[in-house]
């Protein structure tokens, strides 16, 4: 029922048969993921590197040479678990990953042991700040899967995603500004069953050069593009749209932006068309906006 509902709202123009075809393809892919998750328990370093490859190292190698920490952002698309496990084998940066602990302590420990066995550092709300603020022998690449429903609709970034108003996790953008990290989007492409290739795309190397919301808008739209191309590879079984749209959304967005720009005063500011016109007419009252 949830999968059918998500597909209907995301692809309202598609026919019933088209959505049914996507659902069937998703179930087939989900079976592959389950088998690959079991394989992930015992897969060797050699076998994982043979099955999971990088298509372009240049983006991250340049940032590594510059000593830049990176936020790697994507969603639950294709085999994200293999990406988590393989990241420290594939990239020069020290791998780290942010996630919510499972409610079952036993399975949470087992899952994180599998994820961390090749060097991935597992982070959560309790150890994130200490780890990112500590000194490290090499730059860090912190992986964030930012497509799950946020915990609080009033602290989310609201935007259109898959044809509907959606609450987006805003933590990635906050971390980028707080720790002066570069932001890189990654997409995992399925070459064939059990074989993947990850592609990296730079969103920004300097968060302060981006407008409020621009980082979030960009990585979300890139994920949306991937989903529209191959919808069967996204996790449709997640209750993505369970947050209700706030009644005062316009006022909320204005307040959120004001607070964010106060916290990070060096962020690039948007200038409305009206202000630009008055600046161009040399209105002295608006001289303070010229630096934007």
What label would you give each PLM region?
Residues 49, 73, 100-101, 162, ...:
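A generic secondary-structure micro-motif detector
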Residues 21-24, 62, 90, 126-292:
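Non-catalytic C-terminal accessory region of glycerolipid acyltransferases
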Residues 50-54, 104, 122-125, 165-166, ...:
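A conditional alpha-helix N-cap/helix-loop micro-motif detector
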Residues 66-126, 151-157:
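Catalytic core of membrane glycerolipid acyltransferases/transacylases, capturing the structured
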Residues 30-35, 58, 83-85, 94, ...:
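A broad, low-specificity signal for short, low-complexity segments enriched in glycine/proline
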Residues 1-74, 108-113, 119, 264-292:
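Membrane-anchoring hydrophobic helices of lipid-metabolizing enzymes
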Residues 4, 84, 111, 172, ...:
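Generic structural marker for isolated residues within well-ordered, non-membrane alpha-helices
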